[in-house]
Structures are given as structure tokens and as C-alpha cells.
């Protein structure tokens, strides 16, 4: 889960409002239309402030938006189970120590639901001072409690570097392949729980 791949659309299924993609594993993945970021859709030059006639109307029919052979960057949302392939998304999320970067989801962002009360307000104030590029958003994790804007910005800069490396790697070759593998449980535990003062 959370691994990032370059994927190739192999079949568009209008009745499912989804497509199947080859992402370099034995089974093809399932990519619902609602999980495809605007950057991959035709006519994506539309300004965000233009009026929508409902989500479906702004995007048109799925078979008009996507084509077989089209390449996308996808992230595993749910692992393969039984005879079902993995559920995928193009809305990437990269977890750092204090933040989660969503590089192609400008409408996301905020503070983890687990943070409450005054700590939530303090964390919201700290992330409001971050230099988040347009078209991206961040979520402050519980580990961000008590951290200043400078520490959070350092984490954001690292995540931005990681995202640029993922984008660059996706351009190096065509076809389906693994771009980024989520760290092991041990590495994630160290990232999330180890503090210099321990």
C-alpha cells in the first residue's frame, strides 16, 4: 500500500466509470474515474473558478477523457485481495514526519482529525505560514504538534524534493514500473516516533 507507480491504461470501462491499468504487477489495477486528477483529463485548461454543473458534467464522459495506452502516475490505495486487483488513485499523498503532502490535490489539506482543541488551532496557525506551492496542499500530522513553522517547512521542502524526484523518474521511461516504494514498517516507525530527546 502507498507505493507509487507509472501506469498505463489498458481498458476503459464506461459502465464502471473506471479504467483498468497495468502498473507493473501481475494483476491490473482498478482506477475509478473520481480518483483521476484533472491534470490527466482532456480540456484541463479550464479555470478552477469556472462554474461547474456538477462534478460529472465538468468532466464529460469517461471514454472521452481517457484512452488506452495513456500513462499516469498512480498510488496504491487498497492492496490486491483475492482475485481483485489493487484499487489505485492519481491523488498522490506523501507522508513526512510532520506533514502529508498532496502534490496534485489543491482542495485537500488541514490538520489531522486526531488533533483537537487548542493544539489544533496552534497547528493550523503554523501550517498557514508554510510556503505551499499552488495546486498542492498539506495535512499536518499529530507529530507536528508543538512544532514551529520552520520545522514544518523543512519537512515540506523534503517532501517537495521527493515529489520532484518521482515526477522526474516517471519521465525517464515509458511503460508501467515502480517509481517509489513506501518505507518498511520499521523505517516508518522510526520516522514517526523517534525524537532526538529520547
Show the residue positions of the predicted features:
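Single-stranded RNA-binding surfaces
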Residues: 1-198
